[in-house]
Amino acid sequence: MSKYSILFLFTVLFMFSCKNSNEKIEQVQKQEITLYTHRHYESDKVVFEKFEQETGIKINVVKASADELIQKLESEGKQSPADLLLTVDAGRLVRAKNKGLLQSVNSKVLDSTIPSYLKDEENKWFGLTKRARIIAYSKERVQPEELTTYEALTESKWKDKILIRASNNIYNQSLLASIIANNGKTAAKTWAEGMVTNFARVPKGNDRDQIKAILAGEGDLAIVNTYYIGKLLNSKNPVEVNAANAVGLFFPNQDNRGTHINISGIGVTKYAPNKANAIKFIEYLVSKEVQEIFAQTNYEYPVNALANTSELLTSWGNFKEDHLPLAKLGELNKAAVITFDEVAWDKGPNAQ
């Protein structure tokens, strides 16, 4: 072999060695995940920082509304840097799945930790935390013994008493979707009509506003998510604390299907460049320790049965959940939106 051939061989070997070294360095540097999230809670920031410290995996957080994130994933396609989509409401996760934006995940940890009704049957999304949609009532003007079910809110004794958000709110859409799933479309429409008749005002504001309106005497009942009560009770604003203290919590439908629940949930995106790390992150989020952080700081119920709830959540008592598979909320979302429109929900009691 000539000296030129030997030199060429060493050059090739050197370049190959450098290439492998660069690839290994690049792999080490890419110990990261990119998270598209709709959530905006301080608890999440705490959890993300703990994950980074414990694993060395960096989290690149991109925040926007759920609709914006789903649209972003669609437009980016195979070029998307996203590994995960985190949002509230199962219906949104179903929509992302139906658009082909999520992929199946194989994880013994997730299979054994998360109940089947709180996740996608193809493991394309998973519930991380639960929130119950309950009836908040004025402690001064309503006795809890007067309350029973969502359906009973249409009784005439509640005329001009009910406060609630507008129909474009995803929590209301999912509640109505659950009523359609359990009772059928005809009964659900009758319920929605009865609710409109009993509205105290035109639907407006967020869940916190409904609770404040009870304190202000604008109505006696409101349908809200439990974690908002926790946030108001722990607010630095005394007006919000007073509003939360003025209401009691009632978990409806305890003698039949149980109280409607919804979730914050997550899925691995279809073209996730860091799939293994993404799965590791989801497994971390449903661990006992992290689930208890969500319960303590964001007043959400754990999906992990081994996790303890916070003292506040425990004080509200145990309750029976509606175990309707949450995928149904997405499947019936369109029917719920149509029903709201048919009964003129947003025009309030004067519409009928």
Where do the model's predicted regions map?
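Extracellular/periplasmic bilobal clamshell ligand-binding domains
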Residues: E311-Q352
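Mature extracytoplasmic/periplasmic domains
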Residues: S264-L324
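A structural signal for short loop-to-beta-strand junctions that line the ligand-binding cleft
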Residues: S80-L85, Q103-Y137, E151, K161-I164
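Periplasmic solute-binding protein
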Residues: L93-L101, L118-T148, A177, I261-G267
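Short beta-strand->loop
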Residues: Y36-R39, E121, Y137-K139, E145, ...
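C-terminal motif of bacterial Sec signal peptides marking the signal peptidase cleavage site
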Residues: M15-S17
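Early extracytoplasmic/lumenal segment of secretory-pathway proteins
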Residues: N20-R95
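Ligand-binding pocket segment of bilobal, Venus flytrap-like solute-binding proteins
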Residues: S178, N183-F251
